Each structure stands twice: as C-alpha cells, then as structure tokens.
Design a protein with these regions (language model features):
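Carbohydrate-binding surfaces of carbohydrate-active enzymes
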Residues: 1-385
Length: 385
C-alpha cells in the first residue's frame, strides 16, 4: 500500500514524519502518484532506496489518478515510464469501474475496463510494462552512492504557521525543498545512480564493513562506497558517529554546500569537522569522483540531462535502461557511449524484438530519442546470435 502525502519533505513532515521508514512494515511497499504532470520523481526513488535496503523485490504504485478523460495511451506510457525506471513493478491502476451507475462515477481517468471503447487494445500498454518490468528486475543495481535523506532537518523547523497545509512558508524549509529537488535532478542528469539513506535506517541497520578490500557503508541489504551530505541542517549523533567510523576506515564522504549546523537539534560544529571533501553544491558531481558508466550527449557534446538511466549487473552482462523523461523534446542523433565493451543488444519492450545494436571495445552509437522514448540494452561479452 501507500501512505498519505509523499510528494515533498514538507508533506511528509506534516502527515507522517518520514515515508521511508514506513516501508519496512509493508510486504509490498508503494506510492500514490496523482495527476498527469506530477514530476516528483524522488518519491519513487525513496521507495526504491528503502526496498533495496530492506530486500523487498516488489514495489507498488497507485497511478493515473486525477488525470482526465483526455489521458491517451501515450500518457499512460509516459506517466508509467519513469516510475518503472525507478523500480515500480506492480501497477495498481486508478481505476476500473464495477458499473457506471451513480454520481460517484465521475472519476478520472476514464475507466480502465470494458466501459471504455479502447479497452480491447489496452494489452499493448500492459505488455510493454510487463516486458520493461521483467527487464529491470534482472541482476543487481549498480549503485555506489548513498545520499543522506534530510527530512529530519525539517522536523526542527515546525512552529505555528511554518507551512500552509502542505506548502512550506518558512524560508529555510523552502530552500531545503529546492535543494532536495536540485540534488535529485543533478545526479540523475549526470547518469549517477544513488539511494537515499533515512537516518532511522542508518541507526538500526547501518554498519561499516570491508568488502573485497574496500571500506563500505552497509544499510541492510545494500552497500555504498561513497556518502553525500547536502541540504541538511540537522544530523543525528548516531549518523555522525557512523560517518566518522566510515571516514576513519578510508570511506569517502562528500559534503556539498553548508554542513549540518545542529546535532540532535542542538547547535554544533561537529559535522563541519568530519573528514570529508567539502565543496560547493555546483561542484557536487565533480567532487563525487564517480565516473559514469554511460553518457548520452547532443551534437555539441553536452550531456543530455533529460535522459535518465538505470544500470544493473547480471553476472558478466551489463543491463541498461535509458529513458527520455521529457514528453515534449526529442533528441535526434544523440551519442550514446558506455565504458563497457562487447556486444550491445537492444531489447524492445514494445515489440519484444531483440537485435544487435553495436559492438566494440567501447560501446558507442548514435540514437534518436523521441519524446518519452525508452532504450533497453544488454551488453554481453559474447555475440549471442
């Protein structure tokens, strides 16, 4: 299932505190993504992070609610696409009518059932998502970065009239929301995958370990080689202690922007003394020092920020899904390049066709990304024709 109001840190603080820690108690954790133009992608990223850390393989989304009868198949695909990219593999459609009787049936979108004239063709949409979901369930995620989730920093800013309903009024909270969205979009545009780390999870499931001769920070089932601290004004002392241990054993910590000014809601400069790389937020990606395994550039050689990616490793194979999250902008002749070499197969979730797209010591090819286009690839060491 899902909880009420997830779209922002303010909404979570107002209604439930922190959405991520609730997922521990759900067999199939989920979200509710309302409207056609909801671009709060981070709510699904929070769910994906918790699911990875908790070892939960199924992620639910109640989707398509509060859209409209103009909602066509392209819209069904586009709204579902980015959610599938970030792990949604159980689609709970809003909605299907039992009957058309009653005033309560004035709902949106049109019934995804026999009452709609287009319903006999809806399998085209669902077959597409079935293939995409199975594709994204293979292997394990390629994700080395943990981003501390700053929701508890907002808890310290609650006072009369700090917000109006679910909209922040407090200027510091508004800035925290802006930085939160900016961090998400900056990392995704840079083709750098990450998980959020809830401080309650870090306290109860966090540890510092050595893996293959390298220091890692573990949260439950997931391990991370780098930790990013940004957009936080408060940090738990337990989090600070684990980060100190991680740094002392050779772990990599990056603090982008101002470090937390409070520890357990008490003014402190301890976070500013962490052994870490300190940088301005605009230099965050460079300071991370993570070499992306894939890039997608336009004709001028600029990285196309609208194309997001998820990478997974399945034995010797590298699995990649690239997705143009822009519904209006096409990117023709984009240069796609991977650091990996071998044989690059395209798996088409629309038609189920598989064909060889490129090969070489370093996979590189041109591709036309239509608005809302997806590209599913498998890079193998051997030609599997």
């Amino acid at each position: 299932g899902h909880l009420l109001h997830e779209d922002s840190l303010t909404a979570q603080t107002t209604m439930i505190g922190s959405i991520m820690r609730a997922y521990e108690y759900m067999d199939v954790p989920g979200v509710d993504v309302l409207t056609e133009h909801n671009y709060c992608f981070w709510i699904v990223k929070q769910l994906q992070s918790a699911a990875r850390q908790l070892g939960k393989n199924k992620m639910l989304s109640e989707l398509y609610g509060v859209t409209g009868w103009q909602f066509d198949f392209e819209s069904h695909k586009s709204v579902g696409d980015w959610q599938a990219l970030f792990g949604i593999n159980l689609r709970c459609h809003h909605l299907s009518w039992y009957s058309m009787r009653g005033e309560g049936k004035r709902d949106y979108p049109a019934s995804i059932s026999y009452q709609s004239a287009w319903y006999p063709y809806y399998s085209y949409v669902e077959d597409y998502f079935s293939r995409l979901n199975v594709f994204l369930e293979q292997g394990e995620p390629v994700c080395d970065l943990l981003v501390l989730n700053p929701v508890e920093s907002l808890w310290c800013r609650i006072y009369p009239k700090w917000s109006w309903q679910l909209v922040p009024i407090d200027e510091e909270v508004r800035e925290a929301e802006r930085m939160y969205e900016e961090t998400f979009r900056t990392l995704c545009a840079a083709k750098t995958d990450f998980d959020y780390g809830d401080e309650d999870f870090i306290k109860r499931m966090g540890s510092v370990e050595e893996l293959n001769g390298e220091t890692v920070l573990r949260i439950g089932k997931s391990v991370y080689r780098k930790v990013l601290v940004t957009g936080m004004s408060n940090m738990r002392r337990t989090t600070l202690g684990l980060l100190k241990e991680f740094a002392d054993k050779g772990g990599s910590i990056i603090v982008a922007g101002s470090p937390p000014r409070y520890i357990d809601a008490v003014a402190s400069d301890e976070a500013a003394k962490l052994p870490a790389v300190y940088t301005a937020r605009e230099n965050m990606v460079q300071a991370l020092g993570i070499s992306p395994q894939a890039s997608v550039k336009d004709a001028e050689g600029r990285e196309i920020g609208d194309i997001y990616i998820q990478l997974r490793r399945d034995g010797e194979n590298l699995i990649a899904v690239l997705m143009n999250i822009n519904r209006l902008q096409a990117y023709y002749g984009a240069s796609v390049e991977f650091s990996a070499g071998g044989f690059c197969e395209r798996w088409d979730p629309r038609s189920s066709e598989i064909r060889l797209l490129a090969k070489g010591d370093r996979i590189s090819f041109k591709y036309d990304f239509e608005p809302s286009a997806e590209l599913c690839l498998v890079i193998t060491a051997e030609d599997r024709k």
